[in-house]
Each structure stands twice: as structure tokens, then as C-alpha cells.
A protein has these predicted regions:
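Short, hinge-like loop/turn segments at secondary-structure boundaries
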Residues: 73-78, 195-197
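Extreme N-terminal leader/targeting segments of oxidoreductases
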Residues: 1-33, 51, 91
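Short aromatic-enriched loop/helix-cap "lid" or pocket-rim segments at secondary-structure transitions
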Residues: 68-72
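Redox-cofactor-proximal catalytic regions of oxidoreductases
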Residues: 76-155
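Short glycine- and Lys/Arg-enriched binding-loop motifs that mark or flank ligand-binding interfaces
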Residues: 33-38, 58, 96, 100-101, ...
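Acidic glycine-/aspartate-rich tracts in secreted/extracellular proteins
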Residues: 63-66
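N-terminal Rossmann-like FAD-binding beta1-loop-alpha1 element of flavoenzymes
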Residues: 31-58
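Conserved redox-cofactor binding core of oxidoreductases
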Residues: 2-13, 132-211
Length: 211
């Protein structure tokens, strides 16, 4: 268990209303907007709506777990923080889907890789689904806003030997390669991002937009 300050525990002690966390919710709740899920989409949406003056309720299927709970044990993290104990798969069982089931959603348990939707993917969405407004130029200001909010920046730690070999191999093949962008502040490089960040370095929805 982390001995670092836990903003969630501090907030709860000061009276934050997290309904269903420590007590049963009231029979009726009133709000302007109900946001289902507290992950990347739900967290940012709820924050924008709340800043606009609307009363917002967030509904999350999974538990509220914070840095005080993250002990870097897969045996505890997987059944607690993931859908189907990290065993969710595609219908054909070919691909494992590591999907979060906790406050913060998958942003609580992902590995902080933060890249913009590739141009090729946007083009596919336009051609396949008619989403003509989704272009690099139209989305750029929204990406920039999210990157500022979540402190997305280049990973400053030098690559280890196997990743350096991958970079050199890509260079010899003429394939562009660079260090990934990550949404962290003061990362300790513990290597356990997938089990929740015990140091509050990961700028997930759990730490940024939801509180």
C-alpha cells in the first residue's frame, strides 16, 4: 500500500459525496446529466459539463480504488480492476481485451501511451461510417486540450536494451520510430501501470477529471 498522499481519501474525509462507496445511495437523485462510465470518455465529458454549470452524476459499474489500494499485485488487481478479471476476449477468442472496471475505467489500468488517432484510422471512419467531420485539422484543438489537461509529454527515461534494439532495427528498415508520449507527472518507472499507479503519477481520469 502506498504511503504517499491519496487525494481521494483526503476528499472523502472532507465530505465528498461518493454515493454507494461507503453507504447506500438515496432513493432519488436529481441531475441535469447522467454520465455512464468514468473512463476516458465519461471522465472528460463529465468535467466539461460540470464546468459549464450543469449538475452531473457519474455512474460506474466497478469499485472506487485509489493509490492507497494499489499494491502492485496482479492477483488482486486483475479481479478487482478489470472486466472479467482481465480475461475478456473478442467473440472469436483471438484477442484479449484489457478493459478497466473501476473508477477511471481503463485509464486507471492502462500503460499511459497517449497518441492521437492516426490519420489512416480517421480516413477509415470517414469512408466506412460517414464521419466526415473527423479530420486531423478539425480534431487538432481537441487533442491539444486533452494533452494539456492530462500532461501528455515525451517519456524522458532512455529505452532499455530490447527497446533500443527495436529502435535501431526500425531505423535500418527505414521505419520511423520515437519514444511514446505518456500522460504522467513525476513517474517513478515502477513498471506496474497495469495494476493502478501507487504514486499518483499517472494522470488518469481517477486523478484528473473525476475528482
Amino acid at each position: 500500500m502506498s504511503k504517499l498522499p491519496d487525494p481521494w481519501l483526503t476528499g472523502l474525509q472532507q465530505g465528498w459525496a461518493v454515493l454507494g462507496h461507503t453507504s447506500a445511495p438515496p432513493t432519488t437523485l436529481t441531475a441535469d446529466v447522467l454520465v455512464i462510465g468514468t473512463g476516458a470518455g465519461g471522465g472528460i465529458t463529465a468535467e466539461l459539463l460540470a464546468r459549464a454549470g450543469l449538475r452531473v452524476i457519474m455512474l460506474e459499474e466497478g469499485p472506487l480504488k485509489t493509490s492507497s489500494d494499489f499494491n502492485q499485485l496482479e492477483s488482486e488487481a486483475y479481479p478487482t480492476l478489470y472486466q472479467e478479471s482481465a480475461a475478456r476476449k473478442t467473440n472469436d477468442k483471438a484477442i484479449n481485451i484489457l478493459q478497466g472496471r473501476c473508477v477511471g475505467g481503463s485509464t486507471t489500468v492502462n500503460w499511459t501511451s497517449s497518441f492521437r488517432t492516426p490519420s489512416e484510422t480517421l480516413a477509415f471512419w470517414r469512408d466506412r461510417f460517414g464521419l466526415t467531420d473527423l479530420t486531423d485539422d478539425t480534431l487538432a484543438p481537441y487533442f491539444q486540450q486533452a494533452e494539456r489537461r492530462l500532461n501528455v509529454s515525451t517519456w524522458l527515461t532512455p529505452p532499455n536494451e530490447n527497446n533500443e534494439l527495436l529502435r535501431r532495427g526500425a531505423a535500418q528498415l527505414g521505419i520511423p520510430a520515437a519514444a511514446i508520449l505518456r500522460n504522467v507527472k513525476g513517474c517513478w518507472n515502477l513498471g506496474s501501470c497495469g495494476m493502478g499507479c501507487p504514486t499518483n503519477a499517472k494522470q488518469s481520469m481517477l486523478l484528473t477529471t473525476v475528482p
